[in-house]
A protein has these predicted regions:
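NAD(P)H-binding glycine-rich loop region in Rossmannoid oxidoreductase-like domains
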Residues: 49-92, 103
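N-terminal Rossmann-fold cofactor-binding loop
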Residues: 27-37, 51-52, 74-75
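Mid/C-terminal beta-alpha module of Rossmann-like enzyme folds, strongest
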Residues: 204, 220-221, 227-271, 276
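Glycine-rich NAD(P)-binding loop of the Rossmann-fold in SDR/ketoreductase-type enzymes
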Residues: 53, 84, 88-99, 134, ...
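N-terminal Rossmann NAD(P)H-binding glycine-rich loop of SDR-like oxidoreductase domains
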Residues: 3-22
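Conserved Rossmann-fold NAD(P)-dependent oxidoreductase catalytic core, especially the SDR/UDP-sugar
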Residues: 98-135, 154
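Conserved C-terminal active-site "lid" loop/helix of NAD(P)H-dependent oxidoreductases
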Residues: 242-248, 264-303, 308-310
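NAD(P)-dependent short-chain dehydrogenase/reductase
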Residues: 149-208, 216
Length: 310
């Protein structure tokens, strides 16, 4: 299968390059810096720069490569920053997705869009299934939901993958908003880095979700795309925890004694509202008989054992 992987330099993108190694993959990123260590097959095209908000660039890339599938991992996810300026989030998370869908329709390519648990408000208090009505609390969640709606309206050959709290070896900029705004690196790496500073660490304890290892999600996506069973899917590691509980498990696995202090979302005072309960049930994957997502504790243990902190 010819796959155009947009956002190949991110956490999920890099793990997808590995998981899709048996396919013909062209990776794109905002810039090619940071991809030097990614080993591609000799006959694969080198990763190229692509601005997803530039319609001409998108058209040229899609029409020259003519993929069977486009996987869009590109996203603007600085949740708190988006509350102050939602325009960029709408451009990247929604309008660019709509353009991709229209272009994919022209070349008859399927489109896979990675969405978020933040499309829900958390009021259900039980795991969300794919059919539950979304109601985002934040501008970020609204931008991702807009992307979902525009994709569904434009092109039926699509996969929408809702997931949560991604962490992986590539790290991610701006993914630790609930701990310290503008921290670089994913939540796990941020926790391990803050532990070296010797100060108490405050982590919210009233947001329950399922942090997910990108290696596991990439493997699940690789399995799903073989089915051509288009639609909306929830895909997270199994189980649930608060971010405080997750942080404590990070330190336990790392063998670190750290003063971790639980704090409420209200006391933490982040600009964007988060759902108090956004656990996703992988109902559609289970219905297909292909849910391979292991418990979050097992995934985290493997990640911490790798000893990679960025």
């Amino acid at each position: 299968m010819k796959i155009l992987l947009i956002g190949a330099s991110g956490q999920l993108g890099r793990d997808l390059l590995t998981a899709l190694a048996h396919h013909h993959v062209l990776g794109t990123t905002r810039g090619t810096a940071g991809l030097e260590h990614v080993k591609l097959e000799a006959d694969w095209p080198s990763p190229i720069a692509l601005d997803v908000c530039n319609e001409a660039d998108l058209r040229t890339t899609i029409f020259s490569f003519v993929p069977n599938l486009v996987i869009n991992c590109a996203a603007y996810h600085r949740v708190d920053d988006i509350e102050r300026d939602a325009a960029q989030a709408l451009a990247v998370n929604a309008l660019a997705v709509h353009r991709m869908a229209l272009l994919c329709r022209e070349v008859d390519a399927a489109l896979l869009y990675v969405s978020t648990d933040y499309v829900f408000d958390g009021a259900k208090g039980a795991p969300y299934v794919e059919a539950d009505p979304p109601n985002p609390l934040s501008a970020y969640g609204a931008s991702k939901l807009a992307g979902e709606l525009l994709l569904r309206a434009a092109w039926p050959k699509h996969y929408i993958i809702r997931t949560c709290g991604l962490y992986g070896l590539a790290g991610a900029s701006g993914k630790a908003d609930d701990v310290r705004p503008r921290s670089s690196g994913n939540f796990v790496n941020t926790m391990l880095r803050l532990a070296t500073e010797g100060r108490p660490i405050r982590v919210v304890d009233d947001q329950t979700c399922t942090p997910t290892f990108t290696r596991d999600l990439a493997a699940q996506i690789a399995l799903l795309i073989e089915t051509e069973a288009y639609g909306t899917y929830h895909a997270t590691n199994d189980g649930a925890c608060t971010w405080y509980e997750f942080a404590r498990e990070v330190f336990r696995l790392a063998g670190l004694s750290v003063d971790v202090q639980p704090v409420s979302s209200a006391a933490y005072g982040a600009p964007a509202r988060r759902p108090p309960y956004s656990v996703l049930e992988n109902h559609a994957l289970k219905a297909l008989g292909i849910d391979r997502m292991r418990p979050w504790q097992e995934a985290l243990a493997e990640y911490v054992a790798m000893g990679v902190v960025q």
